[in-house]
């Protein structure tokens, strides 16, 4: 599936400009939770909304709650879990730059619904 077939939803726990940065660097569709007006929406509701979009939505988060929701409820949506702990925005971008091509390739397989990126 080409990168423009996915829509990356960027959780509030990530830098506010992450969606814009992903668009500029990878030509993907990306929207922040703020842009989607999810500032006070519970994670369970966000998950249900994303699930209605089939396998297109990729919730990008550092929040283990979405990982747990996927374990409990199933997929869709897809989850890109950034298990990085405390990390500077610059180092987070560097990490994503090295892994994002592989992320897109793995998510192209409909069976891959969860990818975790960790610091080495």
Residue ranges of each PLM-predicted region?
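Acidic, PIN/NYN-like endoribonuclease modules and their adjacent C-terminal/linker elements
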Residues: 1-12, 16, 20-27, 38, ...
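Amphipathic coiled-coil/heptad-repeat helices and related helical stalk/stem segments
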Residues: 15, 42-43, 62
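Short beta-strand elements in bilobed, periplasmic/extracellular small-molecule ligand-binding domains
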Residues: 29-33
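Acidic, metal-binding active-site segment of PIN/NYN-like and related structure-specific nucleases
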Residues: 50-70
